Amino acid sequence: MSTSKRKRGDDANWSKRVPKKKPSSAGLKRAGSKADRPSLQIQTLQHAGTTMITVPSGGVCDLINTYARGSDEGNRHTSETLTYKIAVDYHFVADAAACRYSNTGTGVMWLVYDTTPGGQAPTPQTIFAYPDTLKAWPATWKVSRELCHRFVVKRRWLFNMETDGRIGSDIPPSNTSWKPCKRNIYFHKFTSGLGVRTQWKNVTDGGVGAIQRGALYMVIAPGNGLTFTAHGQTRLYFKSVGNQ
């Protein structure tokens, strides 16, 4: 007597079924994927020759998110922008007045966010409210207590410079060599994750008076009175968002 069992009709049909293939995820385009996102826009601010930055004792404050209205890559296309990243590349060169003395100084560069600029860029002393007795020591400066709701330090970087009482064109005696010093330094920083949102007025220029909320300043101050000039460029990576 055979002990094998006959397959039921539905069992036989089930075993013959071919499993359905799942659609490839590569063929599906997700909403909001990187392919759908607009690429970052780039604005480059160059400072060289007649446009070099002069950094006096007490510092200098410049607006850097200067996105004028337009259709080019460096222009804002809408009434709102988001600045994500910044690259800073400069040569700091001690000026002739500073080179007359043997000196060292610790300078500072800040990126400062201004919630309500009010039509004009502030001075470093407005932001940090330092007394005149601390004018030469920027590493000690802090945002004014009364204005901490307005000014926010996004980044802060230190750098060191030196002078030895000589200028670059001086020539040592034939039997002497002079030790090099940091009268000319290269300063590079790249920072991301800034998330600076700027709301613009209904005007076409990119000055501080065109900003309703969210100005971004680059503040530079020399240490110990070692004044200098800055030669190079700042590159900003941003997007135009919001309404036209």
Swiss-Prot record:
UniProt entry keywords in alphabetical sequence: Capsid protein, DNA-binding, Host nucleus, T=1 icosahedral capsid protein, Viral penetration into host nucleus, Virion, Virus entry into host cell
Span(s) of short sequence motif Bipartite nuclear localization signal: 1-24
Extract the ranges annotated as region (Disordered).
Answer: 1-39
Question: What are the recorded Gene Ontology BP terms?
Answer: symbiont entry into host cell; viral penetration into host nucleus
Q: Which InterPro entries match?
A: Gemcoat_MSV (IPR000143), GV_A/BR1_coat (IPR000263), Viral_coat (IPR029053)
Described by its record, this protein's role is as follows:
Encapsidates the viral genome into characteristic twinned ('geminate') particles. Binds the genomic viral ssDNA and shuttles it into and out of the cell nucleus. Plays a role in protection of the genome from degradation, virus acquisition and transmission by insect vectors, infectivity, and systemic movement. The CP of monopartite geminiviruses is absolutely essential for virus movement.
Subunit record text: Homomultimer. Interacts with the movement protein. Binds to single-stranded and double-stranded viral DNA.
Specify the protein name: Capsid protein
Species of origin reads Maize streak virus genotype A (isolate South Africa)
